[in-house]
Amino acid sequence: MKKDNNIINFVNFPKQHVPLLKIAAATVLKSEKIKRYQVNFIMVDDKEIRKLNTKYRKIKRITDVISFLVVPEFFMGDIYISKTRSQEQAKEYSNTWQQELAYLVIHGLLHLCGYTDYDAVNKTKMFTKQDKIFKCLFYRL
């Protein structure tokens, strides 16, 4: 039997949300044909995510999600999600918190896959893909 070395970790996330979030992550990885991976999702407070954003992106503000591809050859990365921002955005977009976390999991992973949202063309491409995956998870017919 082949041993599966692929790992998806969730740190500091509510346990009841993890099963669906793993499905969201696996859906992105499958759609992008990523076969070997180790991805860590870490929930942090606003202070920590602002610190990461300032240090690595030179942007001195809070963000909802920030992704780091650590070892590209093996698709190993860390994705940090702000607990407070995700809760605020859930209310703002009329989602449950679980839905918003799934959306940010999808978004963060797409960044690791090379998608960007820094200009209109790439943002449209990324958000189209993101919305399609999100709808598959939550709005099956």
From Swiss-Prot:
Which E.C. number(s) belong to this protein?
Answer: 3.1.-.-
Name the residues that span the membrane: none
The keyword Zinc appears for this protein: yes
Record's cofactor remark: Binds 1 zinc ion.
This entry carries the following GO cellular component terms, namely: cytoplasm
Task: Tell me the residue numbers annotated for binding Zn(2+).
Answer: 107, 111, 117
Which Pfam families does the record match to this protein? YbeY
- State if Thylakoid is listed as a keyword: no
Q: Can you say where in the cell this protein is located?
A: Cytoplasm
According to the UniProt entry, its GO molecular function terms are: metalloendopeptidase activity; RNA endonuclease activity; zinc ion binding
GO BP annotation list: rRNA processing
- Major location (coarse): cytoplasm
Please tell me which top-level EC class this enzyme sits in: hydrolase
Q: Which cofactor does it need?
A: Zn(2+)
Question: Which keywords does this chain's UniProt record carry?
Answer: Cytoplasm, Endonuclease, Hydrolase, Metal-binding, Nuclease, Ribosome biogenesis, rRNA processing, Zinc
Cross-referenced HAMAP family: Endoribonucl_YbeY
**What does the function comment of this entry state?**
Single strand-specific metallo-endoribonuclease involved in late-stage 70S ribosome quality control and in maturation of the 3' terminus of the 16S rRNA.
Family statement drawn from the similarity comment of this UniProt entry = Belongs to the endoribonuclease YbeY family.
What name does the UniProt record give this protein? Endoribonuclease YbeY
Task: Recall the taxonomic lineage recorded for the source organism.
Answer: Bacteria, Pseudomonadati, Elusimicrobiota, Endomicrobiia, Endomicrobiales
